[in-house]
């Protein structure tokens, strides 16, 4: 098992290197706040929505912006060791779509079935799945929980952003 140094805020461990995650700005924060509220309202009770949680992905430690996890999820030293049901990455200044795709690929390979990528400045969003497909959302982003679809309306989310 890989041993990690005590993490600093927003520090990830990728490919045996510590990487400082960019700190979010206002649009990122608005979207993250909306997603936490939306998930808290829409998720069945056997799931939790958590922000900025360390997630172990093989030899990496990532910090997705938001994750949905079963209440029965296992932790080691406060880090999530079970796959999330959904990981959400919100683009921050200094990040690229390629950066977020790489992170989603690592999360999916570690067992997370779906990852959403959200780019607030461009009002664009994508779903990345375990089939290694990237699909741009036009009206909604979908996740499946207990064989039931849960759809996030993009227009509802974009309405949280200033014009």
Name each model-derived stretch.
Residues 1-163:
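Gly/Pro/Ser/Thr-rich low-complexity, intrinsically disordered segments predominantly at protein N-termini
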């Amino acid at each position: 098992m890989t041993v990690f140094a005590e993490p600093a805020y927003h520090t990830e461990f990728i490919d045996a290197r510590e990487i400082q995650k960019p700190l979010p700005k206002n649009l990122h924060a608005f979207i993250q706040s909306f997603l936490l509220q939306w998930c808290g309202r829409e998720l069945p009770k056997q799931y939790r929505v958590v922000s900025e949680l360390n997630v172990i992905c093989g030899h990496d430690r990532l910090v997705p912006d938001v994750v949905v996890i079963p209440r029965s999820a296992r932790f080691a030293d406060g880090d999530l060791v079970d796959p999330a049901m959904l990981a959400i990455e919100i683009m921050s200044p200094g990040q690229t779509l390629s950066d977020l795709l790489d992170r989603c690929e690592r999360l999916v390979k570690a067992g997370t079935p779906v990852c959403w990528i959200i780019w607030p400045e461009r009002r664009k969003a994508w779903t990345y799945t375990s089939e290694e497909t990237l699909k741009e959302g036009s009206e909604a982003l979908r996740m499946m929980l207990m064989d039931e679809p849960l759809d996030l309306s993009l227009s509802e989310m974009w309405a949280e952003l200033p014009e």
